[in-house]
Amino acid sequence: MYSGSKHGVRYLLKQNGTLPEGIAAPTCQTCHMQEGNHEVRTAWGFLAVRLPMPDDEQWAKDRATILQALGVLDPQGNPTGRLDVVKAADLARLTQEAWQKERDKMERTCNQCHSLNFARAELEKGDDIIREADRLMAEAVRMVAGLYQDGVLPKPESYAYAFPDLLTFHDAPTTIENKLFVMFLEHRMRTFQGTFHANPDYALWYGWSEMVRDLTEIKELAAELREKHN
């Protein structure tokens, strides 16, 4: 992701002497370890979920669905014990102030080489792609949740609710939920991380396009499971 990004390409060209020594070519450390430590923290965090909910009504619904699949909210939308774990470990930004603090920090870092207007516009592209990726992701989650709701999939004993649980990771009990996990933790992540790192090729072909394919396959698997159930 980094080596094919605009920053990564500049660094490699600088390294092989194509670009002069004094030219800007940010590395991972430049943007993510600004204070010289390993606290690699961003506004959106590792999973690109946060609170409060957005003003965009559709996006708010989609994010709520994803938070339900992460077990942070129950199927009725109420907070669970997992939210307390997230709070205790500070895994995500849970207030607008906390999110804005990290965004401001990143803007200051970008401003070392870019204008603030350019930096903000690029970061907003990342925000926008998260919204679009969440649209696909939430549709897939609801597809699998419907299988549980209609009794097509039996609730596993290890599940707190009859609802897909993304935190089972690769130990998900069904093929369709394994597909859902990969869609979330691999392809959705590539989509937004590739965008934030100015690597559109990575974001599109290894992220977004894979998410679209995942959703198509999940729809087909869901239809097959329903047909067998009936």
Each model region followed by its residue ranges:
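Primarily the internal scaffold of c-type cytochrome electron-transfer domains
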Residues: 1-229
